[in-house]
Amino acid sequence: MIRPAASHPAPKRTSLTAAALVATVGVALAGPVGQAGQAGTDAPATPPATQPAPPASDAALSTAQVRGAQAVKASDPVAADALKLDPVHASSGDDKGEEPARTLPAAASAYASADPDAPVAFPLPDATVTPAAPVPEVPDPARPKISGDTDPTLLRGAIDLYRKGRVADGDRMRDGFTDPAAKALLEWVAIRAGAGIGFNRTVAFVRANPDWPAGPLLRRRAEEALLSEKKAPATVRAYFATSKPVSAPGKFALALALRADGCDADAAEMIRDLWRTESFGRSLEAKVLDAFPDALTRVDHRYRMERALLKDDWESAGRAAGYAGGAYASLVRARRAVEDKSSGAAAALAAVPPSLRSDASYIFSRAQYFRRADKAEAAAAVLATAPSNPDVLVDGDEWWIERRIVARKLLDLGDAKTAYAVASQPAARSPEKRIEAEFHAGWIALRFAGDPAAAAQHFARVAAIAESPISVARAAYWQGRAAEALGQSEEAKRFYERAALQPIAYYGQVARARLGQTSLPLRAPADLEGAERQAFDGRLSIRALRLLGEAGIKELALPLYIDAARDLSDSRELQALGDLATDMKDARALVAIGKLAVQRGLPLDAHAYPTIGIPTYETFTAVPQVERAMVYAIARQESQFDPRAQSGVGARGLMQMMPATAQRTARRVSTAFDVDRLTSDPAYCARLGQAHLGELMEDWRGSYVLAFASYNAGGGNVKKWIDAYGDPRKGDVDVIDWVERIPFTETRNYVQRVMENLQVYRSRLDSRSALLIEGDLHRGAR
């Protein structure tokens, strides 16, 4: 979020720790309820259902083709959230007119973000648990028996009660357990379920379990309770003594407490921050305005309107426009008409009074209107008039997305100069979008505008921001390409060597091939042994994970695994955590643990690419055979090995097959088709998925690049890209550039991720360390 210059830096999402609560506990547990001056609120409002997920591609993609990593377990009660990012909300239709809306699933894929430089998206511990969601019982005769008094049936029953909001009944069942791990687990479930556990009980849990990995959800639950229970100002201020609020209820509660203590200026500043950065509903809006009628100005209301418009939150935008007064409502009508592709969009834009036509919202809408009318040059001219002040842009990342779409359309028209001008103007604010923007500007400058010196500067900026293996390798590889173009061969070699230090990343693998390195080393930490291992295994949270695994409640184990992985910094402990997930046969958790570790530079390469996710199956002989590593590479990207995964557009199972595609493939290989088996029988889904890959390899004459792109975006789109950008199977087409020119961001990312997965899985499954990516990129060459 971009805040006005006068406001404080954005509050960080901090974990709720025992240390942060020490100052609070004494006051909180003794503080009176119903303190004067504290206003309660309704349950924390979520942004409207019409608010879309972040864009995932640069061109219109039919929902039947949007497949990628949208896996969702239909019965999974863990709602979507994204690491270090605000939750993503589902919508229907396309996003920003060109990019398909992404219905981020409840069990978000490890690579659910289409942006390869974005933090990994997971169903994180700060996700919401649906109280009424049943706990699925997964029968498994081979499941080890839980030791002690923790009966798995009783454990599932207690969890189900808490999820249904039956706290008293859940507490009675919990009190029947004697295992401290089971008791702590059930208390954690109760807090997560949002079943009215309350502030004091939440704080008491964290104080009693200082080693429990307390994710952001526990903090949000505590903040909600501070407001709804009208805690005393002293309690509220003590709670926030060491950290800032992370939720709208928390910010409102702190503002009320500050005002009660006479800190009016600080309270007003907190309210302005709340108004500009948080999404919440009409009820809380009214309470904020009633409590602080003089704190917010027309500028604040305009900012809230602008932010809501960029998120397609029409109701909030309309209310904010009303608060701002004047003709701001005309901006909302124009923006919505353009977004909805209404035939009246031009008239709505014309109805905006001249006094508001320099407003950022009007400029954005007008640029999008021209771009959607296939007038990229006109859109670029409008974008050139956009303000540069981030406080005026409000959401620079949304502006960058529009710039990216326009720049790529201009590139397709052969206007590299204007494409570079559009891409190189700074707008993006988040690290992942800044990386994407600088990369695009550098790539266009190097490969299309003939300016390697300018490209080198942009790639250097990427390198300065990059942290994950994917983005570090990409920056270094393209720095090498720019240096080569400048005739700096030794410098280029050093950049390629830097990229090659990331052997599990696509561009790291490409750099290794360029250097003639044929090995693919995978890193692993030392084992945690002796007393340290015993202490680790004895932690209540680790024992709770084992209880969940043995009881078959994987949908609750996953967020706890992720909380633990985020808290741990010792690679040996992360390895031990992964070992536990392996013991529990939880491949999805392994992907999450491994990915979180390698993004921080920790050596958990093997755990990041589990080999336990697909059961043994017989292949069909009626279609060309594909290597087993390819099936794993696809399944990891598509579903994270969740056999019950189902996407918002209907793709199902390990291989995320669309039912119609699976039915055609079943007919081709002469086997019975059963749509339910796609999610109930992982071997069946893997078998059909492998057969479909064989069909695609046949269709594209062995081209891995085209087969992977087709698996994700459909063969029709791939044919269009061949017509537009050339055939990557031909020697006169640079396959690296061809992949980068794929107009769907999701598919660009998908092809690169599956290609890198394939290299790693060859090593993991077949003990082959040879790197074959150069050959894989050029398979099917004519």
State the predicted function of each range:
Residues 31-153:
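Compositionally biased, proline/threonine/alanine/serine-rich low-complexity intrinsically disordered stretches
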Residues 140-148, 171-181, 191-195, 204-213, ...:
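Solenoid-like repeat scaffolds
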Residues 154, 182-183, 187, 219, ...:
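TPR repeat positional signature
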Residues 157, 187-190, 222, 254, ...:
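Structural register within alpha-helical repeat arrays
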Residues 161, 226, 258, 308, ...:
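Residue at a conserved register position within TPR or TPR-like alpha-solenoid repeats
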Residues 164, 229-230, 261, 311, ...:
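Structural motif corresponding to the intra-repeat A-B loop/turn of tetratricopeptide repeats
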Residues 188-190, 203-204, 208, 350, ...:
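Catalytic glycan-binding domains that act on GlcNAc-containing polysaccharides
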